[in-house]
Amino acid sequence: MEKIIKEKISSLLSQEEEVLSVEQLGGMTNQNYLVKTTNKQYIVKFFGKGTEKLINRQDEKYNLELLKDLGLDVKNYLFDIEAGIKVNEYIESAITLDATSIKTKFDKIAPILQTIHASGKELRGEFAPFEEIKKYESLIEEKIPYANYEAVREEVFSLEKRLADLGVYRKSCHIDLVPENFIESPQGRLYLIDWEYSSMNDPMWDLAALFLESEFTSQEEETFLSHYESDQTPVSHEKIAIYKILQDTIWSLWTVYKEEQGADFGYYGVNRYQRAVKGLASYGGSDEK
């Protein structure tokens, strides 16, 4: 692997620059490496096994270029779809946020989401949650291993009409707001990275993802929304509740597919599925029109 990495980033290096070390990092979707050279450090990502069926890399590459002027992401130096590799800027001594630290950064995160949602950018790709569920179902080869899946699925799909009644607004969205996709430089600049799933969707999807992935309390959600909500970025609590259910359903199926490809995520998938079931039980709609 080190040999492949050296070959791929050689075009980025000056004549006197050479690779000193290659260190593997974590990542649920891709294989990530920190590459140190005599002059610089890079993050090298190899697209994970089976991800070509999940992620449209042509769309991702286009979206990264389109969003570049917003200044939200780290620099991308190389995006080679055929080779399945991406080389990004490494932020020295950056702190990766987690489910605790993210809750101290509302004043920085809210403007980032406002910027993308109100940008008017027409991203490639439409993130259609119900189609995503069908996609993963078609990719999974074995019987879906979750209790009462067919009955739960029927209940999940009953939300489609309610969403349509509420109105789904097409805006540019990140889609995958896990806390680890926010990194902060020593100077205090916050970056939003990993735009693989970026596409057009309702901004409430992003808010639901932010809240779910970092397990916000109801009070923390309301506090964040007080930073985010504006005339350009309105809020729908009911859509957030629906999107939480859809996200847990989708990522529980994503886990089944990835584990069929050889990954092992322990109880991650079943925990998300069970949370979707709980979300359905507690969802009561609202008076939103």
Regions found by a protein language model. Give the residues of each.
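A general structural signal marking secondary-structure boundaries and capping sites
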Residues: 16, 71, 94, 113-121, ...
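Active-site acidic catalytic loop and adjacent metal/ATP-binding pocket
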Residues: 29-37, 43-44, 160-207
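Extended, well-ordered alpha-helical scaffold segments
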Residues: 105-108, 148-159, 265-279
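Active-site activation/catalytic loop segments of kinase-like enzymes and analogous catalytic loops
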Residues: 204-232, 245-263, 275
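All-alpha amphipathic helical-bundle segments outside canonical DNA-binding/catalytic cores
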Residues: 234-244
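ATP/Mg2+ or Mg2+-diphosphate-binding catalytic cores
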Residues: 254-289
